[in-house]
C-alpha cells in the first residue's frame, strides 16, 4: 500500500496537500495482549468471517460464520498475533501456529488481511 501511495505522489511535484496521513503503527506484545485479552472480536477476511473470544489464558473460542466453531490458542510476539486452531468438521487438520502483523487503533485493527472490530 505504501508503494502505491508513493507512486501516486511521484507525478505531483511542488503541490502541498497538507500533512501526510499517519501510517498504521505496529503494536507491542503488551498492547496486543491488552487489546485482545478477555474480549470478543468480530473479524472479516478474504475467505471467512466470524467472532473470536480471546481468553486471558491464551485460549480462544472461534465461531466461523456458516461453518461452525473451533478452539484455538493465541499469543502476541514482536508486534504480531500468533494463532493456532484445533481440528473441526470444517477444518479437519486444524491450523498450526501462524503469526501475522497486527496494526490499528481504537476499535479497528488489522491482522494480516483480516479486519477486526470489537464485537
Regions found by a protein language model. Give the residues of each.
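Sec-dependent bacterial lipoprotein signal peptides
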Residues: 1-7
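Lipid interaction determinants
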Residues: 9-119
